[in-house]
């Protein structure tokens, strides 16, 4: 069994990965969402069953978590992240004696995985996307409408005022940029829009607490988590 955390230089930037599982199994690279929302803690806990069939690799993409330090804003582009992912695939093939790896991507990770599989199919055994991005702008329209309708049903005037202040997204972008998006997300999560769970949790309880309690991240990693989310999303 392997349980290895290390940094791999991709596109000139040292980036954090966690490799865990049976070295004899096929390699599965997990592509997180956001961009900028690393999820090593969920990959290694919530998705731990994947280790029965795969050597699982969780990666903090450029600008996030353990890959925050030194990530210049001009390098935060889709093309650069696709190239980073390809370089990581090649490194994994060399390191573990494989010809191809499997990809699993959620939300933004599904978009990244689609580009990666399209450009470099010779190194990809298969790609599975969940929460697959097809039309990001439409996603945001539906998300905003859901949050507004739920707040109206609940008579939640405070949340309604917040949503009307940021306004409906235009081409997927909220008024106020990152801050406007986060204001919408807090209302959406308040009314259960984050997952199908019947439990309605705040952004802090849904996203922050699991990271802090997981033990997956070092202090520098957590600083990268806190700073990287805004940094990457604003840049991209």
Where would I find each of the regions flagged by the language model?
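A short loop-to-beta-strand scaffold at the N-terminal edge of the catalytic core in hydrolase folds
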Residues: 10-20
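Short beta-strand element of the alpha/beta-hydrolase
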Residues: 25-34
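The serine-hydrolase catalytic nucleophile loop
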Residues: 38-47
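Conserved alpha/beta-hydrolase
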Residues: 50-69
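Conserved hydrolase catalytic core segment
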Residues: 98-141
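A catalytic-pocket lid/entrance helix-loop region that shapes and gates access to the active site
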Residues: 124-170
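Alpha/beta-hydrolase
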Residues: 157-236
């Amino acid at each position: 069994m392997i349980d290895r955390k290390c940094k791999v230089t991709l596109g000139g930037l040292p980036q954090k990965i966690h490799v865990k599982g049976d070295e004899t199994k096929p390699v599965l690279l997990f592509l997180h969402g956001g961009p900028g929302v690393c999820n090593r803690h969920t990959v290694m806990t919530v998705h731990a069953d994947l280790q029965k069939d795969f050597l699982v690799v969780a990666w903090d993409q450029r600008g996030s978590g353990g890959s925050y330090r030194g990530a210049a804003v001009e390098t935060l582009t889709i093309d650069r992240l696709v190239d980073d992912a390809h370089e990581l695939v090649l490194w994994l093939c060399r390191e573990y004696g494989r010809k191809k790896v499997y990809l699993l991507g959620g939300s933004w990770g599904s978009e990244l995985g689609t580009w990666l599989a399209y450009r470099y199919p010779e190194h990809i055994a298969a790609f599975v996307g969940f929460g697959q991005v097809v039309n990001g702008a439409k996603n945001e329209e539906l998300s905003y409408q859901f949050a507004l309708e739920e707040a109206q049903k609940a008579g939640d005037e405070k949340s309604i005022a917040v949503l009307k202040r940021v306004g409906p997204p235009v081409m997927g972008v909220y008024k106020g940029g990152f801050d406007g998006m986060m204001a919408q997300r807090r209302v959406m999560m308040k009314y259960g829009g984050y997952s199908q769970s019947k439990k309605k949790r705040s952004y802090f309880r849904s996203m922050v607490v699991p990271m802090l309690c997981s033990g997956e991240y070092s202090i520098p990693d957590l600083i990268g988590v806190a700073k990287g989310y805004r940094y990457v999303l604003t840049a991209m």
